[in-house]
Amino acid sequence: MKIEVAPQETTRAEAFSLWMTSPMPMVTLTKTFNVTKLLKASKRCGIKFNALLCWCIGKAASNIKEFYILPEKDKLFKYDSIAINIIVNNSKGGINSCDIAYTDDAEQFAKEYNRLTAQVAKQCKSSFLEDCMIVGTSAMIETELDCIVNQYTDKFCNPMVMWGRYRRNWLSTILPISFQFHHVQMDGGHGAVFLEQLQQVINKL
């Protein structure tokens, strides 16, 4: 469910007054993750690496209250659920978006991931969940990337998690991940907590 809230009645009141009209309100943090356990769990459970990473992102985000509030134009909205947006390569060589509702059940999330992304790819038609707070993702696995900075626009204020190809060495597998968010939604400290919790979720797989 999505409802409008009065900014002054939330913990983001000061941030709303400071950053809502800023021409560049987005913040990007980058952290290098140890994804060794993620890769092993992916193979053990038969779940695609990116699907399992998206579930981990949802798991980490679901425990942080700032993820349930999002600015939109000159208003602030509160949500009671989270979904992950996937960029899908479609059958015509273009791309579409696909929203997948987060659930605590990783296997169920993976099933929906496979079903919905295949449907979107075949139909070349995006699928959106309007009543969920959307965490955007973008996996550019064609090459290794150190950092990704997304666009600054008032048309897309949602948090965005982005990564390239993971890197293997003798002892571990690492993956730099970039996280962009709107300063009205959260502060840098909240973003850092999310990245740390994401690593902890991965470590527990």
What is each of the regions a protein language model found here?
Residues L38-N63, L175-F194:
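Acyl activation and transfer enzymes in specialized metabolism, enriched
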Residues E9-R12, K59, I64-I69, K73-K78, ...:
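Catalytic/RNA-binding core of pseudouridine synthases
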Residues E130-E144, P159-E196:
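Histidine-centered acyl-transfer/condensation active-site motif
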Residues N90-L145:
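Helical lid/core segments from catalytic subdomains that handle acyl or acyl-like groups
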Residues M1-A13, M20-M24, K37-A41, G58, ...:
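Domain-scale detector for complete catalytic domains at protein termini or as standalone homologs
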Residues K2-Q8, M20-L52, E66-I82, V135, ...:
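Gly/Ser/Thr-rich phosphate-binding loops and adjoining beta-strand/alpha-helix segments
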